[in-house]
């Protein structure tokens, strides 16, 4: 359960960076069509559901695996690696102080707490889904006695605001007290929801919220998704209306608004959220120019490229050390396997050989770390620009410590090539 929770935690953290970007874009793109905001939330959903991601130099995600399962379970001092120095420096000292491994223990204390957190997450997921099911069944019971007036359109005395109920075969339910003008405007709105497939997207958003209920940023994202769905639907309805019809539509919005405590799961209720903002948006609506629409599409593409991809991992010696072989002015190796460590300065040819062996290594990045057990050797490099890097080696792991530049030390699991490096 701990492994599942840590996987979801890392996906959640990666998506949180995207949510922050969407929040900024929502603030600065007031003139953009509202469907752009919904599309941006769709990109957030993709980030949450995709278990994999391609690597790209254009990625703006600081780290694809902020919390490494291997580091949490086995590292002497568990740490996170967000690649944001302010966050790492604030969190890691506390983790090291309270969750450092006990020499006689098989796993870190943090791993035990992570296992507990996994079961708490599962209970929370069950509670969220149970809430959705109970809300759906209660609403079904309320509308069980309804009068059909058209195909899949019903009048109901037990409701005060219209909504759509159902995912596969959606039905529109209208309060029986609506006059003809209100009914026409309400039906236009609800049918626009159906045309946009909003009766799919909102329940999907709630399911994702249920899975990631532990992340408050995603609660904010879901709330704004519900609001943006309504705004986008309003724009679809009023884009062909004249000024008088828009005013009538806005009046109906106010008349059909419902309390904020209304059900937030399956129903897509007319007037459900942000009524004041929706009325203001309707009254001031202007059809966006072509260049605004084109710019909105371009923004969505750029956001997808930058936030659906992961940052590239270190793939060669230059990536590990932080500078290329031709930039190295000094290199040495320390044999730490014996009681008395011995140090030898490497010649140019030996430095070439070490870089070639580092190039041949295959490894997986585990995360940030400050120490490593069973180190048998230490490599030390200095560049012409004064950059310094230390690499500590063990049988199955490698700790890369960029001494200069303010970067965090990184722990790697060695997959292949470590035997050749050790023998050399």
Predicted regions and their residues:
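Hydrophobic membrane-embedded segments
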Residues: 1-130, 134, 275, 312-314
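Internal/C-terminal transmembrane anchor helices
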Residues: 42-50, 287-312
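Membrane-cytosol interface motif
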Residues: 43-48, 145-162, 231-239
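Hydrophobic alpha-helical transmembrane segments in integral membrane proteins
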Residues: 132-143, 304-315
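Active-site scaffold of zinc-dependent metalloenzymes
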Residues: 158-181
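Active-site recognition of the HExxH zinc-binding catalytic motif
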Residues: 185-198, 205, 233-234
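Short helix/loop segments within enzyme catalytic domains
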Residues: 195-196, 220-277
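Function-determining sites in protein domains
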Residues: 313-424
């Amino acid at each position: 359960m701990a492994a599942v929770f840590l996987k979801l935690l890392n996906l959640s953290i990666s998506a949180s960076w995207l949510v922050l970007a969407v929040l900024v874009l929502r603030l600065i793109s007031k003139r953009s069509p509202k469907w752009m905001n919904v599309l941006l939330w769709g990109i957030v959903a993709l980030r949450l559901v995709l278990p994999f991601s391609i690597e790209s130099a254009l990625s703006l995600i600081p780290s694809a695996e902020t919390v490494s399962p291997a580091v949490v379970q086995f590292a002497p001092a568990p740490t996170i690696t967000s690649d944001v120095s302010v966050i790492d420096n604030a969190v890691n000292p506390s983790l090291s102080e309270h969750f450092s491994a006990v020499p006689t223990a098989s796993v870190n204390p943090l791993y035990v707490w992570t296992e507990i957190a996994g079961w708490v997450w599962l209970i929370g997921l069950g509670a969220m889904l149970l809430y959705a099911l109970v809300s759906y069944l209660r609403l079904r019971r309320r509308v069980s006695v309804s009068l059909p007036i058209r195909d899949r359109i019903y009048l109901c005395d037990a409701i005060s605001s219209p909504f759509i109920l159902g995912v596969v075969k959606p039905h529109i339910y209208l309060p029986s007290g609506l006059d003809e003008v209100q009914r026409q405007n309400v039906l236009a709105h609800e049918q626009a929801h159906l045309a946009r497939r909003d009766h799919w997207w909102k329940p999907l958003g709630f399911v994702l919220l249920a899975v990631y209920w532990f992340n408050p940023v995603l609660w904010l994202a879901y709330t704004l998704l519900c609001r943006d769905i309504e705004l986008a639907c309003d724009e679809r309805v009023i884009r062909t209306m004249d000024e008088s019809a828009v005013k009538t539509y806005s009046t109906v919005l106010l008349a059909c608004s419902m309390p904020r405590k209304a059900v937030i799961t399956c129903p897509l209720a007319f007037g459900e959220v942000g009524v004041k903002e929706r009325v203001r948006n309707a009254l001031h609506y202007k059809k966006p120019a072509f260049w605004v629409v084109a710019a909105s599409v371009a923004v969505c593409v750029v956001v997808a490229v930058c936030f659906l991809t992961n940052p590239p991992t270190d793939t060669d010696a230059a990536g590990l050390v932080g500078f290329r072989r031709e930039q190295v002015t000094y290199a040495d190796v320390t044999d730490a396997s014996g009681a008395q460590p011995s140090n030898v300065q490497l010649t140019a040819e030996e430095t070439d050989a070490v870089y070639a062996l580092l190039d041949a290594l295959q490894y997986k990045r585990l995360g940030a770390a400050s120490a490593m057990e069973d180190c048998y050797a230490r490599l030390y490099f200095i560049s012409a620009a004064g950059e310094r890097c230390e690499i500590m080696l063990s049988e199955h792991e490698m700790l890369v410590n960029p001494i200069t530049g303010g970067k965090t030390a990184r722990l790697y699991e060695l997959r292949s090539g470590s035997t050749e490096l050790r023998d050399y």
